Amino acid sequence: TARKDFSRDRGSAVANALAVEAMANLLLADRKEALALAEEGLVALARGPVLFQMWPACELLCAVLLPLWQDALTQHADNEPRLRSAALRACRAARSLGNICPIGQPISLRAWGTVANILGQSRRAHKRLEEAVVHAERLKMPLELAQSCLALGRALPDDPERRAHLLQRAHHVSTELGCSLFAEQATALLTETPSSPTQRKP
């Protein structure tokens, strides 16, 4: 189906709508369309300062672009530089969000912790992701807590006991919220053999 041309539109609603579409396509395994929509979302974000109401776009664009970049890095794909650039732009938007409102802080910390994990910077990844968990708890943001526990669990392949605890917590919180997507992700991670992140210098 044809989708709306957002090229002349302005405002947070545009970036948010594009980010939602990008995530939907990623979940449907249409990575090419997910990337195209995410890049459009980044353009929409760049039209002005990051505002509070842009938090869905900031969060979802990171959630789409970071795994695409990680897969490209693992597969030595030709478009890895493009995906890296897009993912880091999304993370910078998340950081801007975290600088202007508290709810952006766990989003930013989780994004940059994931970047560090992708680059093989384990200590930095663990610190940022642990801070994301703490901030989500402090702000009473259970959905962010579940996602931060998932991200930290992914970053702890060499600590199976703590990894399992975090993933079980993510599953419990997600189930309580009725969020089957994150509950299923936690279950999948609990049943797979953890692997170390791709080593790469920044």
Regions found by a protein language model. Give the residues of each.
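Helix-coil-helix junctions within alpha-helical repeat/solenoid scaffolds
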Residues: T1-K201
